[in-house]
Amino acid sequence: MYNHKVVEKKWQDYWAKHDTFKTGTDPKKKNYYALDMFPFPSGKGLHVGHPEGYTATDIVSRMKRAQGYNVLHPMGWDAFGLPTEQYALKTGEDPAVVTKNNIANFKRQLNKLGFSYDWDREITTSDPNYYKWTQWVFEQMYKKGLAYEAEVPVNWSPDLGTVVANEEVIDGKTERGGYPVYRRNMRQWMLKMTAYADRLLEDLDDLDWPEPVKEMQRNWIGRSVGAQVTFKIKDSDKTFDIFTTRPDTLFGCSYTVLAPENKLVQEITTDGHRDEVNAYIKKIESKSDLERTDLNKDKTGVFTGAYAINPVNGKEVPIWISDYVLASYGTGAVMAVPAHDDRDYAFAKKFDLPINQVLEGGDLSKAAFTEDGPHINSEFLNGLNIKDAKKKMVDWLEEHNCGEKKVNYKLRDWDFSRQRYWGEPIPVIHWEDGTTSLVPEDQLPLRLPHATDIKPSGTPESPLANLTDWVNVVDEMGRKGKRETNTMPNWAGSSWYYLRYVDPHNDKELADYDLLKQWLPVDLYIGGAEHAVRHLLYARFWHKVLYDLGVVPTKEPFQRLYNQGLILKNHEKMSKSKGNVVNPDEVIDEYGADSLRMYEMFMGPLDASIDWDDNGPASTKKFLDRVWRLFVNDLDLKAIPQERIVDKNDGELDKVYAETVKKVTEDFDALHFNTAISQMMVFINAAQKAKTIPREYVEGFVKLLAPVAPHMMEEIWQVFGHDESITYAKWPTYDPAKLVESTVEIMVQVNGKLRGKFEAAKDADRDDVQKQAMALPHVQKFLEGKDVKKVIVVPNKIVNIVAK
C-alpha cells in the first residue's frame, strides 16, 4: 500500500537537503521565469483556493526544468499593510512578530504541498534590506519630479484611520473591511502616474494577457480625445475651461456645471443663491467619487445665479453646480447639451432647463438623440456629420483663441501616503525653513522604528508622529526638521518584487542589470483577476519609470499573464466569516498533497470559478493508487511487477502513448491541465488492458505525471532504479508516425447492404483486401449460389460486392 504521509515527507526533506530547485545558471540553456502573485501572509493561513494558481506555475516550472531550461520559480511575502496592522491593533501584538509567525505558517503549508520554489530567493517586503530599495525607487521618482506633495481631495476612511487610493475604493467603500469613504482635502504624497498614461495604454497591445484585464486597464486609464473650451463669466473678467469629447455640439449648450469644490463657485455665486449653494456643498462633501458618478442615479444640483457666455454664439447660459462633476477629472467643469447627452437630458428635464437640438434625428420629447446625423441650428456646422463637425469646430475655437484640441484621461496620479504605522517610511525630511530633502541614499534604509502604540491618530499624521525621538532631526548646521510621518501603501513593495527575486542578496543595487536582462520579462505570471487595476497597473508604472532610469532592460514586466478562477464553497467565495473555508492541511493529511494538487487541476479549466467538492481529492487519490498498483509490486514496494512491465515493445500502446506525450506537453504549455490529466487517465486505462507495458512508456508516463503528483512519481522513479531525482530527467518525446493508425477497419457490403467488417493493414494491396473480404464467413453466406459480377474496393474504407 502506498503511504502518502511517509513518501511525501521523505521527498520534501530530500528536495530541501539537495537544493533540488535551486535556479539554474547554465549559460547554454534557455531561461524560464514562472511567477506567482506572492501572498499576503495573513493569520488564517492558506485555504484550498490559494494552491490552485501555485500548482499551475509549479507544473509548468517542473516541465520546463525537464525540458532543459534554467527555471526561476521563487516565492516571497507581501508583508506590509492594513490587515496585519488591524490584527495587531486588535490583539495588542507587534505587527513584526505577527508577520514573522504568519510567514512561518504559510511556508510550512506551501512546503507540504510540494511546490518547487527556490527558497534561497525568498523576499519579504517588510524586511529593511528589501524596503531599502523600495525607498530608493521613491527617491529616484522624487528626483525626476514624479513624486510630489500636494493638497488634494482624498478618500478618507475614519474607520481605518487612513486615506485609500481610488483603486482601493469599491462601490464607495474600502476594499479592506468595506468601510465608508469620505472626501476631504489633505496634504499627500502623489506619484505622477498620469505622466505615463499613453505608454501604459499603448504597450498593452504587446502583452499576452487576458483581454478583459487589458480592457479594464484601458477603461481605468480612460483616454478620450476632445476639446478644451474657454467660457467667459458674464459681468466678470473671470473664465473657466471645460473639456468635452463633443465640441461639435457647442451650439446646443444650454447650461454649464461646475464641481462644487471648484474655487470659482464661491466667487461667482450671487447673494440670492449663496445659502442654497453652501447647503448643497455641505450635503455632498462626504460622498466618494464613485457615489457621485457611477452609483449616482438621481442627479442633484443648484443654480449659482451666475451666467457664462457661450463662445461660439455669445448666448448666456446658467452656471449650476452638481456633485456628478468632479474637481479631479478634466477641468472640474462641463458644458451641458441635453439634446444629445443622456445625463444632461435627465438633469435638464429635472430642473426644467432648455433643450436645444443641434443634430437631426430622434424624438427629444422622449429622450436625447445620441447617434450621428447632420448638424442643424449650428451655423457653419450645418449639414456636417459628427466627425467632420468636430474637426471644423476645433479649428474655429483655435482660430478664435477660445479653445483647442485636447486629450484627457480618467487616470489620476497615485495617492501614495498612508496615515498608518505598518508600511515603508517615506524617506523625506521637512525642514523648519520650509524646504524638503531626501534622506541621503547611503543612509537607506530608513528603518521603521519600533512602536508600542500604533493606533491611528485620526489625523493626517500616522502613529509615527508620536515617536518624537525618531521624527525630530537636526542637520550639521543646526537646522531643525521633522521626518515625514506618512508611510507608503502596501502596493509599493509589490510594485517591483519580481525584480528582486532575480538578484535578492545584492546590497549595491536593486538588481544586477545583466541578470535582469537574462530573466526579464517574466514568462508566466499567474494570479487573481482582482488585481487588474491596482497591482498590475502600479507594477507596470514602476517598471516603466525604472526602464527610463536604465535600471531594467524591458519596457514591460510580465509578458504572459493568466488569471486563475476562484475555488468556491457552496457557490460562495471562501471566507472565515462565512465559515466555508476548506483547510488544505486537513485534505493533505487525509488524501496527500499529490491528490489535492491533482484534484485542483482536474476540477475544470484553470480560469473558471468552480465549486469545491469534498469528495474530489478522494477520487484523484483513487486514480493515483491505480497508477501505483500498476507500476509497483504491492507485496514488495521496492520492486516492479516484472511480468507486466517489460523491455520489449509489442506496439499495442504505441498510439495512445504518442497521443499522451503530445497532448500533455501541449496542454501543460496552454495551461489546460484538466484535459492533460484526462489524457493521462486514457493512457492508464489502455495500459491496464494491455498484456504488457514497455518499460520505456512507463518511465515516460511517470515523467509526464511528475509535475502534477511529484511525490509519488519520485518514489516510482526510485523503484525503477534511478538514483537521481526525477526533476531533471529528460522530458519525454514521441514519434509522430505512431500517431497514425497502422490498421484500418474495412466495411464489406453485398449488394449495397453491410454484411461484415474486418481489420486490414493501412494502404494494403487491393487484391489482399478483396481476398480478406470474400473470405469472411458472414459474407460467404450471402454469396452462396450467386455469381460475383463486380467487386469495388475503396482503399482503407469499403469493399462493395455485386452478386447475382
Curated annotation (Swiss-Prot):
E.C. numbers: 6.1.1.4
Motif range ('HIGH' region): 39-50
Subcellular location: Cytoplasm
GO terms of biological process kind: leucyl-tRNA aminoacylation
Residue numbers covered by motif 'KMSKS' region: 573-577
Any one of the GO CC terms: cytosol
Gene Ontology molecular-function annotations: aminoacyl-tRNA deacylase activity; ATP binding; leucine-tRNA ligase activity
The keyword rRNA-binding appears for this protein: no
A Pfam short name: tRNA-synt_1
Protein name, as recorded: Leucine--tRNA ligase
Gene assigned in the entry: leuS
Catalysed reactions, semicolon-separated: tRNA(Leu) + L-leucine + ATP = L-leucyl-tRNA(Leu) + AMP + diphosphate
Annotated positions binding ATP: K576
Superkingdom in the source lineage: Bacteria
Organism field: Lactobacillus helveticus (strain DPC 4571)
Keywords: Aminoacyl-tRNA synthetase, ATP-binding, Cytoplasm, Ligase, Nucleotide-binding, Protein biosynthesis
Family per record: Belongs to the class-I aminoacyl-tRNA synthetase family.
